[in-house]
Amino acid sequence: MAMAGSSVAQKTWELSNNMQEVQSIDEIYKYDKKQQQEILAAKPWTKDHHYFKYCKVSALALLKMVMHARSGGNLEVMGLMLGKVDGETMIIMDSFALPVEGTETRVNAQAAAYEYMAAYIENAKQVGRLENAIGWYHSHPGYGCWLSGIDVSTQMLNQQFQEPFVAVVIDPTRTISAGKVNLGAFRTYPKGYKPPDEGPSEYQTIPLNKIEDFGVHCKQYYALEVTYFKSSLDRKLLELLWNKYWVNTLSSSSLLTNADYTTGQVFDLSEKLEQSEAQLGRGSFMLGLETHDRKSEDKLAKATRDSCKTTIEAIHGLMSQVIKDKLFNQINTA
């Protein structure tokens, strides 16, 4: 019974995150040093600022990053990723946490973190892990996957001296709330580069106190298409992990775990609605300002979408609790 429950929970997680199994382990795990050196020498990303379009993340690296991000609670955490490049795809094979000081708005890497980073990569090579550092990750607890002004500056610096390099952002709070990993992979454009108009990107809820930071820098980077993969070896490791942790799915509730997050969402939504109402009220006294009205209506539409998202997540959490109550607390003894 326990094994069956574990299997169902694992399958649900894999389907939610579109996890793909690699048939041949050697196909993606084999490290071709000569090929990687040729790519580094050619530097095709210098000719095309939008060269890298895809990012593949191994299931093991994904779990390590999400568990690390979750352990930080409301504080941001930071880590490094190891991997390689295959054409227009950046492949993340592994990840490790960095000993950094985190706050609710940023992570501060000190000298000890850089020493730890260098020692880890060197020791990894000594045990046969030949992949190089391919990027860094950090968490945005509760406010979505995007790059702030500090993140953009950090990534620009990394791309200047450590190419190829990718920035990954994880939101552990929304991951628990939605039941699906909330992760984004990004690369920045060089200073002074104006990207072509790519049309509207996928909508995501941004808290009111973060909107300005998001809007100012959103044209300085682009998102890569992220997919996840696992090998037969990963499958064995995942089974061991799920056998240990699957009970947490039944014993925990997103309504209780994310109570502070949900409350914060409601407060943020009320502020957005008040702001939209005030702007619409001012617009009614200002003649000939159709652009102003359109912007106000656009903000109101976004606030409506945010309210729908919060409501759906709350309903899903409530439905989950009702189902568990029916299963375990109302057993018919007749």
Swiss-Prot record:
A motif (JAMM motif) lies at residues 138-151. It is found in: Cytoplasm, Cytosol; Nucleus; Cytoplasm, Perinuclear region; Cytoplasmic vesicle, Secretory vesicle, Synaptic vesicle. One of its GO terms (cellular component) is nucleus. Its EC number is 3.4.-.-. The keyword Hydrolase applies. It comes from the Eukaryota. Keywords: Cytoplasm, Cytoplasmic vesicle, Hydrolase, Metal-binding, Metalloprotease, Nucleus, Protease, Signalosome, Synapse, Zinc. Pfam families: CSN5_C, JAB. One of its GO terms (molecular function) is metal ion binding. The keyword Secreted does not apply. Zn(2+) binds at residues 138, 140, 151. Residues 55-192 form the MPN domain. GO terms for biological process: negative regulation of apoptotic process; positive regulation of DNA-binding transcription factor activity; proteolysis. It is an enzyme of class 3 (hydrolase). Its cofactor is a divalent metal cation. The CSN complex is associated with some 'Lys-63'-specific deubiquitination. Such activity is however not mediated by the core CSN complex but by the brcc3/brcc36 component of the BRISC complex. Belongs to the peptidase M67A family. CSN5 subfamily. Component of the CSN complex, probably composed of cops1, cops2, cops3, cops4, cops5, cops6, cops7, cops8 and cops9. The JAMM motif is essential for the protease activity of the CSN complex resulting in deneddylation of cullins. It constitutes the catalytic center of the complex. Probable protease subunit of the COP9 signalosome complex (CSN), a complex involved in various cellular and developmental processes. The CSN complex is an essential regulator of the ubiquitin (Ubl) conjugation pathway by mediating the deneddylation of the cullin subunits of E3 ligase complexes, leading to modify the Ubl ligase activity. In the complex, it probably acts as the catalytic center that mediates the cleavage of nedd8 from cullins. It however has no metalloprotease activity by itself and requires the other subunits of the CSN complex. This is COP9 signalosome complex subunit 5. The lineage of its organism: Eukaryota, Metazoa, Chordata, Craniata, Vertebrata. The gene is cops5.
